């Protein structure tokens, strides 16, 4: 199949059908993919059980799944309104890069991060905290391990001190729109 299964918009139907747990399908999914997908489905399921009668999927939850590398989404064989198997262009859609992980929050604006992909001072970054709702922040400055201010983070796994305009919780994934 050249598309990826996405059932986030059908949580009520799945729960009513007796499904009580969800599994991430596919081989070699990254930690970033797993974190984003787990966070989205966890919020969707919790929101559904908090308000089963008037459940509406919050737009940010579905938007999260567009921030991971994926092929075009469909619902597979679950419903009859589209083909369950599609054999066409199976190209991947990639709108975001995971650029860092927050190792430690020092204060309201300073974090120790481990770089994953290149980004620059001044970039708007999208933060996925370990729990809670993702938020945007701006990279105000970067300092390398020698205390030298740098304009970019070009070296994978480099530890940097980053100042931003928000507190970034420890273990947050920091990403950037391409």
What are the functions of these language-model segments?
Residues 1-178:
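Surface-exposed amphipathic alpha-helical tracts and adjacent flexible/coil segments at the periphery
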């Amino acid at each position: 199949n050249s598309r990826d299964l996405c059932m986030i918009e059908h949580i009520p139907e799945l729960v009513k059908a007796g499904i009580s747990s969800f599994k991430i399908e596919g081989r070699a999914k990254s930690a970033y993919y797993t974190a984003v997908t787990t966070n989205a489905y966890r919020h969707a399921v919790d929101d559904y059980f908090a308000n089963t009668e008037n459940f509406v999927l919050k737009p940010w939850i579905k938007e999260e799944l567009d921030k991971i590398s994926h092929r075009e989404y469909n619902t597979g064989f679950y419903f009859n309104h589209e083909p369950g198997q599609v054999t066409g262009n199976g190209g991947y859609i990639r709108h975001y890069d995971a650029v860092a992980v927050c190792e430690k929050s020092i204060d309201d604006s300073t974090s120790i991060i481990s770089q994953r992909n290149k980004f620059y001072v001044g970039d708007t970054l999208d933060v996925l905290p370990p729990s809670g709702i993702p938020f945007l922040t701006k990279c105000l400055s970067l300092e390398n391990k020698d205390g030298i201010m740098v304009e970019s983070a070009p070296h994978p796994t480099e530890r940097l001190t980053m100042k931003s305009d928000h507190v970034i919780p420890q273990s947050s994934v920091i990403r950037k729109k391409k």
